[in-house]
Amino acid sequence: MVAKTCGAELKFIECAKDGSIDLEKVKELITSRTKIVAMTQVSNVLGREYPVKEIAKLAHEKGAVMVVDGAQSTPHMRVDVTDLDADFFAFSGHKLLAPMGIGVLYGKEEILEKMPPFLSGGEMIDSVTRTSAVYAELPHKFEAGTVNAAGAAGLKAAIDYN
């Protein structure tokens, strides 16, 4: 929907019959015009792990941001986002047996610093006047409203369990 709204062209990485990805074909898809490369680390359909680290390198060589869906990988394997060099890494808590409605979005600090908040309120505001607001430092800059404390406690317990 976002691509349609802003006129972006979506390109898809095709899988072989065995579910593998040809890195040479990926290399052809990522150009200097590519802004975002988004993919799953492990397929929920095929159960296959993909070469996210190698694809992140290709994306970064062209100046693109790498976004990784870790919903299927985080419950089953140790994930090191810095080793993957993912700019963003997201997973839902319920896949780890945490309560519904909580998840994690990791983002590189230098990217998050440049991003404006998309919600407002609560502790995300450091100071406010009648004409302007100063946002709090990370991570509070993106935490509008009341924190889901019960969900966070459940997520921690689920991570410890896994």
Residues covered by each model-derived region:
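Pyridoxal 5′-phosphate
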Residues: 1-162
